[in-house]
């Protein structure tokens, strides 16, 4: 496999896409299945340490994992020659591979939007990065939590669509 070949770049970006996706969805599931249910059990005087030290670091990797995943996913689809067909869900092409990967891409795009434009702005209020009143912080906590739960639910069909394409056939 030549370094300049499309096959090499397809492999490289697909691998980065998988690693980034693990980083993103791993953090998503950590927040929803570990941190959120555990926070009420943490003594009140220790909670600020979690919000000040652990949460910002975890959110950094969560946010940028989402960005790397969507960018490398688009690159993989472009190099693989199925970007446009996947975006239109393979409609009119009778191509189940592009339909499945397209649904996965659209679900991933919705999740990415939630991370960058709903979860993170609200988490910044919770962490005190953005000025907010106590009522705004409570509302931001609820909105970020709801968007995070939506992403957790969307991650299951998204992962199914992304993985199942390998069994349907195609790149």
Q: Where are each of the predicted segments found?
A:
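Polytopic transmembrane helical bundles with strong interfacial aromatic enrichment
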Residues: 1-171
